[in-house]
């Protein structure tokens, strides 16, 4: 990664203020001040156990911080519980789909929880991720990579502006990885935001790519750290 550069001055749409996370009586990180604006991609890196997934879950509203708060569009996340589905999309490390349902049924169910989608839109999204002809196939018969594609098809529907993705490239083949990289970069170029963890070395990133090293944050004993602009590691 290149040397840290000046942090963009665009108004942050996602920010944390004094964020701290403790798990099993161990402080993973603290005093984290993070700002992310439209068009930016933040890759969270760090050794195992540094709190990467915990941070993503905090940003998604799936966990409560030990201290501090997360703000989305200038408002505390805790005040937006009923609105989060319109503002952010979380896809975790596991595919999160139901094996007895077909690919189409899984997407219909997932979209109904957030933003309902037409059958035509769902079929097109499945085609976009290379699953044309698998719409009615029970997901338990699909490979791990195909199941991952079903989950990622949500990114090709009417998705919210903020995407929070935990290891999205897991189980994807080379073609699937390249396609997803292009799609994520395009989302940022259109004014969206992406926060992700991945062990994959990114080859395509938007101009607003940034990196947050939780290992460095821990080594600094919780000092406030701004993510650095830079090339993917």
Curated annotation (Swiss-Prot):
Tagged with keyword NADP: no
Subunit structure: The complex is composed of two ATP-binding proteins (CcmA) and two transmembrane proteins (CcmB).
UniProt binding sites for ATP: 46-53
Function summary: Part of the ABC transporter complex CcmAB involved in the biogenesis of c-type cytochromes; once thought to export heme, this seems not to be the case, but its exact role is uncertain. Responsible for energy coupling to the transport system.
Entry's Gene Ontology BP terms: cytochrome complex assembly
Protein name from the UniProt record: Cytochrome c biogenesis ATP-binding export protein CcmA
Family: Belongs to the ABC transporter superfamily. CcmA exporter (TC 3.A.1.107) family.
A Pfam family per the record: ABC_tran
PROSITE patterns given in the database record: ABC_TRANSPORTER_1, ABC_TRANSPORTER_2, CCMA
Localization annotation: Cell inner membrane
SMART domains: AAA
Membrane topology recorded in Swiss-Prot or TrEMBL: Peripheral membrane protein
Catalytic reaction annotation: heme b(in) + ATP + H2O = heme b(out) + ADP + phosphate + H(+)
Protein EC: 7.6.2.5
Record flagged with keyword Cell inner membrane: yes
InterPro entries listed in its UniProt record: AAA+_ATPase, ABC_transporter-like_ATP-bd, ABC_transporter-like_CS, ABC_transptr_haem_export_CcmA, P-loop_NTPase
GO cellular component: plasma membrane
Keywords: ATP-binding, Cell inner membrane, Cell membrane, Cytochrome c-type biogenesis, Membrane, Nucleotide-binding, Translocase, Transport
């Amino acid at each position: 990664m290149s040397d840290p550069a000046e942090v963009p001055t665009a108004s942050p749409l996602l920010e944390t203020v004094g964020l701290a996370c403790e798990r099993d009586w161990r402080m993973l990180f603290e005093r984290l001040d993070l700002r992310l604006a439209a068009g930016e991609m933040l890759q969270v890196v760090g050794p195992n156990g540094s709190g990467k997934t915990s941070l993503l879950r905090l940003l998604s509203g799936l966990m409560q911080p030990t201290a501090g708060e997360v703000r989305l569009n200038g408002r505390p996340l805790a005040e937006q519980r009923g609105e989060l589905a319109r503002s952010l999309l979380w896809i975790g490390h596991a595919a999160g789909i139901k094996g007895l349902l077909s690919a189409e049924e899984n997407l219909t169910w997932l979209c109904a929880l957030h933003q309902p989608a037409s059958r035509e839109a769902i079929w097109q999204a499945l085609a976009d991720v290379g699953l044309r002809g698998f719409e009615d196939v029970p997901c338990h018969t699909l490979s791990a990579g195909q199941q991952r594609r079903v989950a990622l098809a949500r990114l090709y529907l009417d998705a919210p502006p903020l995407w929070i993705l935990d290891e999205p490239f897991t189980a994807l083949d080379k073609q699937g990885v390249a396609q997803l990289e292009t799609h994520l970069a395009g989302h940022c170029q259109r004014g969206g935001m992406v926060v992700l963890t991945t062990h994959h070395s990114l080859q395509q990133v938007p101009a607003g790519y940034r990196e947050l090293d939780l290992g460095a944050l821990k080594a600094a004993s919780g000092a406030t750290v701004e993510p650095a602009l830079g090339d993917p590691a």
